Amino acid sequence: MTVLTIYREDLPEQPLTQATDGAAEIAALLAQQGLRFERWPAQVELADDATPEQILAAYATEVDRVKTEGGYITVDAVSLRPDHPDRAALRQKFLAEHIHSEDEVRFFVAGQGLFSLHLGDHVYALLCTQNDWISVPAGTRHWFDMGSQPYFTALRFFNNPEGWVAQFTGSDIASQFPLLP
């Protein structure tokens, strides 16, 4: 279930607002902050071990639309499972607050991940689940938690042919907010 929890940056133990699984409500709250959120319908039933090519083919219509709208030049599919040998190191890398010089655009084909967005003096923690699509504007301070036992498959859209390139802020704010188990 998709959940958006909003906190003041100085009160990580006290949520101000929580929206649960109402795509329209979540999209409206995020749009007020300049972010886009959509829920895409499942196109086909994909096997847990589906290849990146099969995943991209299953969502070809949506992928083409987003590439055209956003001018994205590359799209890939990434999967992480609990048995991935580098899961702990990858989790730590993404948990550090960072920004990008391009939009960070993700679609969750399966599983879940927690995007925490540091917007002004608030933190918007969005638990993305299957069929959720999010676009985080360039320059937005954020971090991502995949959990200690990650399970997700996501499409990633890029303007930069180098792919995921982060500029870390040096802030420890991510360590103050709830994480996935």
Curated annotation (Swiss-Prot):
One of its GO terms (molecular function) is nickel cation binding. CDD domains: cupin_ARD. HAMAP family: Salvage_MtnD. This is Acireductone dioxygenase. One of its GO terms (biological process) is L-methionine salvage from methylthioadenosine. Pathway: Amino-acid biosynthesis; L-methionine biosynthesis via salvage pathway; L-methionine from S-methyl-5-thio-alpha-D-ribose 1-phosphate: step 5/6. It comes from the Bacteria. Monomer. PANTHER family: ACIREDUCTONE DIOXYGENASE (PTHR23418:SF0). InterPro entries: ARD, ARD_bac, RmlC-like_jellyroll, RmlC_Cupin_sf. It catalyses: 1,2-dihydroxy-5-(methylsulfanyl)pent-1-en-3-one + O2 = 3-(methylsulfanyl)propanoate + CO + formate + 2 H(+); 1,2-dihydroxy-5-(methylsulfanyl)pent-1-en-3-one + O2 = 4-methylsulfanyl-2-oxobutanoate + formate + 2 H(+). Its EC number is 1.13.11.54, 1.13.11.53. Catalyzes 2 different reactions between oxygen and the acireductone 1,2-dihydroxy-3-keto-5-methylthiopentene (DHK-MTPene) depending upon the metal bound in the active site. Fe-containing acireductone dioxygenase (Fe-ARD) produces formate and 2-keto-4-methylthiobutyrate (KMTB), the alpha-ketoacid precursor of methionine in the methionine recycle pathway. Ni-containing acireductone dioxygenase (Ni-ARD) produces methylthiopropionate, carbon monoxide and formate, and does not lie on the methionine recycle pathway. The record marks D103 as: May play a role in transmitting local conformational changes. Keywords: Amino-acid biosynthesis, Dioxygenase, Iron, Metal-binding, Methionine biosynthesis, Nickel, Oxidoreductase. Its cofactor is Fe(2+); Ni(2+). Pfam families: ARD (PF03079). The record marks R106 as: Important to generate the dianion. Ni(2+) binds at H98, H100, E104, H142.
